Structures are given as C-alpha cells and as structure tokens.
Amino acid sequence: MRYSASLVIVALFGFFLYHNLQPKPVNTSKEGLVLESILSTVQAVHLDPKPIDDTFSETLFDDFIKKLDPSKIFLTKKEFEDLQKSKFLIDDQVNARTFEFFEKSILLSEKSISRAKKIFEEEINKPFDFSKNETIETDREKRQYAKDESELRKLWMQELKFDILQTWTSKKSAKEKNEKKEEIKTDEELKTQAVTDVKKRFENYFKRLGELRRSDRMEFYLSSVSNYFDPHTDYFSPKEKQDFDINMGGQLEGIGARLQAEGEYTKVSSVVVGGPAWKTKKLEDNDIILKVTQKGGETVDIAGMRLDDVVQLVRGKKGTVVILTVKKKDNSVVDIEIERDKVQLEDGKAKSVMLNIPGTLKNIGYINLPKFYSSFELEGGNSCAFDVLTEINKLKEEDVNGIILDLRNNSGGSLNDVVDMTGFFIEEGPIVQVKGREDNPYLHLDKDKSVEYDGPLVIMVNQFSASASEIIAAALQDYNRAIIVGTPTFGKGTVQRFFDLDRAVRGYDDMKPLGNVKMTVQKFYRVDGGSTQLKGVIPDITLPDLYTYIDVGEKEYKNAMTWTEIKPVKYSQNVAQITQKKALAEKSKERISKHPQFLLIEESAVKIKEEKDKTTVPLNSVSYTSMKEQKESDNKKFDIVMKDDIANLVISNLNTDLEKINMDEKNKALNEEFLKDLRKDIYLEEVLYIMKDMIGLEKSFTTQQKKIAEAK
C-alpha cells in the first residue's frame, strides 16, 4: 500500500522547470516576491489556472473587503465607494506586482476601526433604551453601508443593544433555572451585568484588532488572491504552515502546554498529559506566564505581547531548555525550567471502544477518526493509517464481530493514509483515480494482498465528511465492501499539495522564508469514474439530519470547481460482498419512521431552515424576549433529542487502553466525555441495528460470524 510517486515527480518537474525559466521579479520587496511566487506557481501547477483579468479583480475586491469589514460596521458608504473605484483596476496592479488597492484599503480600514472604537467607547457608557420599536438586520448581504458617521453611530448602537439583549435574556433564563443555586438578582442588576460583559467582549475585540500588523493584513490579501482560483488554494505564512503541520501531524517540539490570551498576559489553558511540562509536575492549568527565558539567553517580559509571539518563544527544538516565570493561583511567582521534547497531541487521534446490546448484538467495534492526520516533517511522526490498523488489531484481539468506522465531521487530510487505510479491507486493487492537467489519470493502488479485517463493516458519514473521508467511503461503496450510512457528504473532490515559495524565486535569501502556497493540483475520481466534487458521496442508507434543508458543503462556494467524470477502471474484491443494500435501507427506514427522536430531528430541520431565513431581529426588550420565549417554547420538545443514554447500550474501553486512561485524571475525564456522547448517540444506535440486519442478511458472512454476533 504505497503512494504512487510518478505524479509527484511530474508535478514538481513542471514546477521547477517553470521557475528556472522565470525572469527577474518586477517587484523585489518581500511582499512583491511572495505575490510573484504565488502567481507563477499557479500558472505552473494549478489544475485550472485562470487569467488575471477583470473577473479576478472584481472577485478579489469583494472577498478582501468582506475580510476587512465582515459585518459592515466599519466602513461608510462613501469610503466603500471610494475603494470601489479600484474594483476593476486590481488586476492591472497585480500583473504589475504593485499594491495600490491594498495600501488604500488598509489605510481606510485602520482609520475606520479607530473611529468605531471611539464610537463604542462613547456609546457603551450611555444608557440604552430598550423600549424603542427598532430592529437590526443580522445578514451581512442584506445590510447597507452607513451613509455617514451619524448613521454609523446608530448602527453601532444597534450592534451593542443586540449583544446586550442576547446576554441579558440569557442571564434571565439562567436565573429562572438556577434560582436556588445562585444569588437572586433583579432584572436591572442582570442588565447592568450584561452591559459589563458586552463592554469587556468588545474591548478585547478592539484589542485584537489593534494588534493586527501590516503582515497580518497582507496575509489576508494574499489569501484572497489565492482563493480566487478555487476555495482550497491558499497562502500560508511560515507560522501558519508550522501550525498546519502540527495540526495534521498531531506532534510538535515544545513543552506540551496549550496557551490562551488573558488580558495583558498569557494563561496556561491546559497541560498535555505525558508532555515535558506535565512531567515536571510544576506547570499547571491556569498558571499565568509573566516572562520567558531561553536558558543561557535573555529574559523576555511578555506583558502585552501577542499570543502567537509568546507561542514562538515557548516552542523550540527538542533538547533545548526554556524557563517560564509564572504566577500561581495563590499569587506566588515561581520559575519553572522545562526541557523541550516531542509532544504527542492526542486530540483528533483514532480511538476505539467495544459496543454491546445484551440480547441483541455482541462485540461490535467502534473506531472514531476525526481527521486523516499524518506527520511528514518529524521523524517518528503520527500516521492515522497506522493508528487505525492498531485499533483494528486491538479489536480483533477482543473478538470483534463487526466494525463501525465513524468519519462524521472528518474534513480529510492525508491522501497516502486514506489509500493505505482503504486497503485494510480489500485484498488489492485501485482505490482512487487522480487527474491533473495531464490527459491520463493516475491510479492510487493498494498493492498489498493481505486483508487486515474481513468482517462486517459500516462507515458513518455526514455533510462535514470531506475529501479523504469521501475517498474511502466512495471506494468501499463501489467495491460493495461496506455500507455507508448518514447524510450526503461535503463534496470536496480535489487534491491539494504544498509548494515552498522559497524555491520559486532564485536568490533574495535575506527575505526568506516567503511561506507556502497550498495549491489544487488534481481532482480525484472514484474507481467507477464518477466524482465526489460538489455531489459528495450519497449514503446507501440516509438518516435524518438537522441540516437537511440548508446548503452545506462545497456547493456553497461560488468559485468551486465543476463536477466532471472519467472512465471507470476495473475493480473487484472477494472479501465480503454487500448485496442487500436495498433491503437494509428499507429496514432502517421503517425503524426511523417510528423512532420519536428521528421524527423530531426531521421536524427540527424544517424549523432551522425557517429560522435561518428570518434575519431581522427586534431590539425592543419586550418584543425580543417574546420572540426568544416563543423559540424556546417551539424548541422545547426537541430538547429530548440525544439527551438520555440509549437503553441497554453497553460501551466498554478496550483492555489494552485502560492503563493509559487511568494514568491521569485528565485522561479519565476526556475518556468519560467521549463515552458520554456515544451513550446518547441515536445515530450510532441505528447503525448498530443496521449492523445486526447486515450480519443476518448477507451471505458473505459465515455461519460462525452470524452466530457469535448474537448475544447469548
């Protein structure tokens, strides 16, 4: 099960050949070099490069303005119209590698933020009149820019009133539910507290805006340039690429502590179990970091420093030492010396449990995979394929009779790993076709004849299962190896690859690193020739969902690539053929039609669509409270959905996992939270009954499998 290297060689050859022939950059500033590198890389390797013309200019203008003023609460109509004069000139500037529109827009943006902050500081301390019959439009697309500063001030008053109303009514609801547990406060006191909370939130908001650097805004701009070509082509600064690699690989070199901003300081939000900081037994959750010292180097007072700058000070190579000066809960100040090391992040990693319904079903393994992670940069890095195989083997050791692979909310990741993982369930054969600019598609094959698991298999998906999740679901559906259950998936049928922009420009070493561009270089196709682009994977068995009547997924993007198809390839497998999909779907449909919670989910989906279409909200306290109470009354019957544990469902940790779970109270708590959600999951309950039906109906499964799958 190995990734075909030929495609990588072709793509990289084209990339380097193109750049070796490039003339000297027109604009040799760092920003100019980055822009030059992005655009030349697009032309060299993007699946479908577009010309830099008026369409580009118009699209970039709309996207960048939306990033600068997402709620239309900063710019006035006159300022917007002033910027709009550049709407069809940006392409000329980009082709010349100049930044006139960018310069003008950030100048106006900074000015408008400063003005908005002043308005906020003046208005938040004035009394708010909630007796007026006025409304606020919450949909940005329906909003108009304020005509002048007077109208802008009115808009800010509405924004503040809306936030205060939301906070105030939430506090009143909490008071009604918890009167015996909390100090009883008057309605006026709750309103005052709501104003204080909103004031603090906006102060923090303006503080974050004030910390934005030119480089941050340039990253937004370069992202808009990249996004024009398709939604998944994007620019990554060196720091963003580092964070992406950590997220994908689940591993970093540092101290193993999660940090968050706390006023002027940085707080330890959690210490990673098993990491260097945890091993010292000195650094604790909620410690406030005051200073950071590299051993043998200078001490840096981090008061007022941006969180990402603090993170860069704390991270470092394995074996190096950092000293944190922290303030404890008792206000004592201590120095904590920590030797950096590799840190394994357990968040998002594959994990499994055993499911039983006594008298109905026995020993069904459940594997949860939140993302297709892989560590390319670090030696000994994580691989989700390896981890899933580990979970399969652990389940087999405990006599598993069926496996459920849960890919709900899994947005994808490593193509290599999904090819390997799909191969665990078939003998050998094609997994996915990928096609770039070349005429001929490339096949990613499972070349390993061994089968890691040959029993009953169900894959759970939803509308947020994307990319790699869709590859494995589509392949095993086409092979009739598994039943796919859930909702139509996201519909991302494209492949991206990172390109280091330092390699796109010769010389200029003093300005590097320039960052990376994540580029769409291929589409992937099912073995039957179809594509998941826009359409997603349609489940064999569809279950009700809250988002049924709302557009979710790739089709939401205006610049999404189109659906296409190519010729199918020959494929077959003899491990286990699922032949009773129609019968299984009918049995599930019958159960769903009688299941009170699924019926409520269908009803709730209609309500969600109706509420989404209502974008005008009253700012009169009586009207707002009445509206909220009506919503709560309408939605009260939906509260029972996935609130209680499923009757008779027994979920057990695997014996091999117990030692790790019990090594720390945090691990115990995280495990209990994981199990708690599963115990209430009616989708999982229905999948268990689908598994039972499948084992009973399918001839592929042996008499012995049918026998041991039934509880005695």
Region locations from a protein language model:
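Extracytoplasmic/secreted envelope proteins and their assembly/folding machinery
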Residues: G32-L39, D53-I65, F80, K87, ...
